[in-house]
């Protein structure tokens, strides 16, 4: 089971270079399992025992498995994750012609580590909006092959490179995508037009706009002398999306189960399809349109907010509290912060520990050092937006927000098992 889950994750990461592609990948799995797509623009007709999913902006998704009992009686079991990761996004007018090379101007999305982006074989993917035959359309594109690189400056020309050299995002991150002949001009939108034709057989009248991100073409892999680790891009947080989907599709029981995978977490979640927007609440209210039904059901519900945690790095162990250092392959981590950067409280943490113990899954705790700041997740945002009790958890990871992150190869199976137990749980605290 562990090897199969890990290979499934590797395949999912390869198919999901952007939030748009991740959402499409999730939707394909759901449809293959018998889930029916609901369109927010239409009237909905749902029924007990039904299987449904909803997307918004092509980059966020909510999957719904309705049980036989009403949510007014048993509530919802929700698992939340996010589809986005830090990356380099192409600017609207990106062409930069310098010294005979064509580069593309990029904007940093989220809190990316810059240095790992150098000397990588990069490709480009995302969503393109265009006009064809007088009609406005959008399609996902993925160049797949390596088309760009950000070469490092040789140390002979930068002797301070290993002494904490700061990287200027504006000047040093534009990737090189081609060499130009003297006097040659380049139009990036024409390249997109050609890609639409190759990938979709569409000839666009004009490419109007796009949301495109560079990504590393190196596939994720199981690594380590004893295959202890998984290395790959976008583990934060497609690892949790994949675990949530596997748990939902394979969970026993007949409860009301929800998987929420939203975009824009890395930039604050404040969008119409992010966790700080109305997406989840609007979907739940449409499932419970009568009077105070939503408010009553949500107070019987619980959210597991799943987002990667910082594992104790052997070279930097002093960055952790000595008593709260999560180990890779040590199981899911309960995240706790007294200042509500995480939404966990004693009741929700206790319930998650109980699930882990009953499932024979190891569990760990994470608290930041008292002299360091703490990141946050969709947990507090969703809790405050919807009013749902929440526990923040995640799998321990190294190199978070790098172009290539590292997680334990045993931990995915741990997380899928306990999330499956959560979905199947007949009683919530």
Swiss-Prot record:
It is an enzyme of class 3 (hydrolase). It comes from the Bacteria. Its EC number is 3.4.11.-. GO terms for biological process: proteolysis. Zn(2+) binds at residues 82, 156, 401. GO terms for cellular component: cytoplasm. The keyword Zinc applies. Keywords: Aminopeptidase, Hydrolase, Metal-binding, Metalloprotease, Protease, Zinc. Its cofactor is Zn(2+). The keyword Zinc applies. GO terms for molecular function: aminopeptidase activity; metallopeptidase activity; zinc ion binding. Belongs to the peptidase M18 family. NCBIfam families: PRK02813.1. This is Probable M18 family aminopeptidase 2.
């Amino acid at each position: 089971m562990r090897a199969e889950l890990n290979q499934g994750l590797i395949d999912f990461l390869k198919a999901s270079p952007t939030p748009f592609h991740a959402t499409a990948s999730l939707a394909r799995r759901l449809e293959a399992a018998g889930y029916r797509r609901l369109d927010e623009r239409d009237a909905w007709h749902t029924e007990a025992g039904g299987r449904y999913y909803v997307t918004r902006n092509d980059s966020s998704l909510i999957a719904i498995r309705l049980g036989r009992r009403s949510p007014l009686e048993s509530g919802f079991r929700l698992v939340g994750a996010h589809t986005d990761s830090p990356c380099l996004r192409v600017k609207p007018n990106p062409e930069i012609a310098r010294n005979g090379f064509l580069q593309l101007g990029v904007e940093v999305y989220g809190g990316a580590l810059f240095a790992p982006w150098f000397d990588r074989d990069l490709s480009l993917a995302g969503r393109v909006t265009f006009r064809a035959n007088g009609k406005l359309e959008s399609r996902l594109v993925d160049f797949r092959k390596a088309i760009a690189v950000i070469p490092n400056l040789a140390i002979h020309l930068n002797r301070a490179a290993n002494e904490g050299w700061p990287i200027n995002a504006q000047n040093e991150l534009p990737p090189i995508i081609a060499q130009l002949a003297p006097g040659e001009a380049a139009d990036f939108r024409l390249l997109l037009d050609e890609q639409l034709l190759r990938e979709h057989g569409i000839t666009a009248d004009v490419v109007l706009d796009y949301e495109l991100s560079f990504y590393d073409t190196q596939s994720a892999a199981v690594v380590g002398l004893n295959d202890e680790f998984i290395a790959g891009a976008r583990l934060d947080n497609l690892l949790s999306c994949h675990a949530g989907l596997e748990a939902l599709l394979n969970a026993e029981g007949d409860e009301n189960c929800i998987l929420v995978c939203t975009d824009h977490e890395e930039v604050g979640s404040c969008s119409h399809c992010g966790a700080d927007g109305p997406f989840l609440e609007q979907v739940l209210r449409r499932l419970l349109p009568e009077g105070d039904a939503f408010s009553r059901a949500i107070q019987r519900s619980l959210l597991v907010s799943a987002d990667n945690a910082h594992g104790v790095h052997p070279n930097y162990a002093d960055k952790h509290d000595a008593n709260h250092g999560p180990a890779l392959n040590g199981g899911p981590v309960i995240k706790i912060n007294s200042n509500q950067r995480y939404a966990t409280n004693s009741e929700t943490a206790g319930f998650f520990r109980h699930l882990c113990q009953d499932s024979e899954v190891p569990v760990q705790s994470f608290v930041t050092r008292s002299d360091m700041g703490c990141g946050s997740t969709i947990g507090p945002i969703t809790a405050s937006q919807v009013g749902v009790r929440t526990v923040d958890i995640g799998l321990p990871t190294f190199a978070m927000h790098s172009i290539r992150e590292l997680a334990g190869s045993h931990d995915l199976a741990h997380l899928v098992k306990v999330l499956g137990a959560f979905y199947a749980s007949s009683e919530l605290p």
